[in-house]
Amino acid sequence: MKVKYNRLSSLSQSGNRLTDDKTQYDLVLLDRVSGSVSFKERPKGQELTKLVEQGKISELWVEEFSRLGRNTGDVIKTLEWLDEMKVNVIVRNIGLQSRPNGVKNPIWKMISSVMSSLYEMELENIKERTMVGR
């Protein structure tokens, strides 16, 4: 099954940017939760986890790494688990796949670690700017 996972940080976000994708999916899951919440603690993250454990998902599409979370450790743990489960994770905004044609992508681990760290740093900057603005 080909699944797209989206996450919006707040209830006020429309998600239009995420729905402009015209790719056909078997299932689209949308969590409206902060990226600091662990992937497996999110309602749709839990649904996705069950489907993966049942062997029903072969491809997981995300718009960008930050949709999986803003905590580097949690994102990497989630990606490693998905890899163990042989799920090909595809990140649309950079066109990167974890397992193209079922074979591990050698550059995947490095790129996913760097990108996850950058998104965590971005979250810290947002928090800092929010505190200064109060």
Task: For the regions a language model picked out, list residue spans one by one.
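Short, structured surface patches at the beginning of a domain
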Residues: 1-133
